[in-house]
């Protein structure tokens, strides 16, 4: 056996990636054990950050991809990022993509910054090999081929991609999801679905993970149309969006973890999130970003279900905002073990009593089964210390109080640490842990 064949596969792949297609092909005549490795291209990447026309280097890159197809090479991962694209360049790009698809690509990433009438080649939606696909950004997916079918696709990421609804062809978004029989994860970034023409429904019986992230939070005065979520097998849900007018259908029966950030963008809202709140019933880990999001559980408190499975709750809080909504959540979470909050709520300087009426002396904590409490924004003020004392006196099951303190002064750190460790605790098992950040 030759010495080259003894090299690890990772080293061989690295050597091959530095060679031209022609040079790499010649290697199979040098070492028989390189034959299978040479025919596999681990990654092919092209990044053009210029705003001008496609460079000659991309045309050379496209030629190499064509040679790889002619030599029956396979491409594991392909990434194409173009800062701009004009009509005259559409054919060059799409021919390159067709060659990539014929090379049996597994991981396909496209970031083509175009605002015109550009359309992806239809073969994108009939690729039998691709397992992970990322599409972006700015173009429209209007019509899918009738034979659209992505039998191996498990992860689909859409970045600032818009969809259209045709009276004859129907909803292109719905058709795309239906063409993915094993899809497990869907990520929609830059989601301004009021700009979409679609069915306003995310429906899948097999989807496990869904992320919807809005990038623009400016309200232009238009209404935010309803969205339905019919995803009974979903286990992970990350939803950062503006509030919708309503959520007609919400089926999230298998939900394990949910992260929500739903700020209100305008006064006089007509939104209705009752079904969305009810749909979270089976969640085990719930993270609520933005104070507005938690406030929804107070506004629609009659719709809040009993969270039998919830054991970890993380919420955004502010020292000047009442805890009425947090009380609702705690009362509806009989098996909660871990609670993470940002700031403690208290009255400001000059008040005789720093404890707000909404807290009712913290008596509502007596029935809470919380074992771990984390406070991530603590300044060590007298009013804050008083709130911690009340908390420790009322959480009977508490095992760990973790407090993050923002200070860099050594003497201040020592004083805060000493004050916290001196506070009485209702639970003899409770330990106080202070982290300075």
Swiss-Prot record:
Protein name: F-box protein At3g62430
Taxonomic source organism: Arabidopsis thaliana
SUPFAM superfamilies hit by this protein: F-box domain, RNI-like
Domain F-box: 1-49
PANTHER family: RNI-LIKE SUPERFAMILY PROTEIN
